[in-house]
């Protein structure tokens, strides 16, 4: 079924399909990884080109990598077609070294998906989607007004890897709507934010509304006490 790059092996807990990724196409590898690394947070990135034209596009190869300094990482591929031409977002970040990550909730989901259309370079996706923006505090790139939260970023570095790249951005400011902030921490009221995540396949997403549950985390001292009580 999968040819020479995959085979089944029996282990103590059942049958396992093993894939040799050195023999798997990029598309097949993509299908496997996005199905396993899920759900993924969505970075709805706004950026400007050198002429000041706004671009917006979503990316789910995204997460935070550290807090001192605060670093986020985004994997950005190339535009469809032959050659290695980075997507508008990657080109804009490299040119201006600034971008904004906007958090996507259920209310913004359809507009976010619309902005993923492969429009010609220089197209303002947010204008077409009738999504308003507001000025950022430290970067020239505007942020999405309706986003529950936004992260102003400056490019820390970009790592070119094969036909794609990983952009490391340093977060220099965070904007969060009042209703999603608990001032005691400050903490994010994540249960009320209703963020969405990306799953496998085109158009496949997951809601976080009503999906939270708690698993008590045991300390080493708790574990020692529990073990002593069992004896």
Residue ranges and their predicted role:
Residues 12-231:
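Basic, polyanion-binding surface patches
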Residues 1-16:
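N-terminal amphipathic/basic-hydrophobic helices that include classical n-h-c signal peptides
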């Amino acid at each position: 079924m999968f040819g020479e790059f995959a085979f089944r092996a029996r282990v103590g807990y059942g049958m396992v399909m093993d894939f040799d990724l050195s023999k798997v196409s990029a598309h097949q590898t993509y299908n496997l990884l996005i199905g396993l690394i899920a759900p993924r947070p969505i970075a709805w990135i706004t950026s400007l080109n050198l002429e000041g034209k706004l671009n917006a596009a979503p990316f789910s190869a995204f997460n935070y990598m550290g807090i001192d300094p605060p670093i986020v990482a985004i994997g950005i591929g190339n535009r469809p077609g032959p050659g290695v031409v980075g997507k508008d977002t990657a080109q804009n970040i490299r040119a201006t070294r600034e971008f904004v990550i906007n958090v996507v909730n259920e209310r913004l989901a359809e507009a976010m998906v619309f902005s993923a259309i492969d429009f010609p370079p220089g197209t303002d996706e947010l204008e077409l989607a009738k999504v308003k923006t507001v000025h950022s505090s430290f970067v020239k790139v505007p942020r999405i007004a309706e986003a529950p939260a936004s992260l102003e970023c400056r490019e820390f570095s970009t790592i070119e890897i094969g036909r794609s790249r990983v952009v490391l951005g340093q977060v220099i400011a965070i904007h969060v709507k009042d209703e999603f902030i608990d001032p005691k921490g400050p903490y994010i009221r994540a249960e009320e934010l209703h963020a969405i995540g990306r799953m496998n396949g085109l158009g496949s997403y997951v809601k976080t509304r009503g999906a939270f549950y708690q698993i008590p985390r045991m300390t080493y001292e708790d574990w020692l006490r529990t073990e002593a009580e069992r004896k």
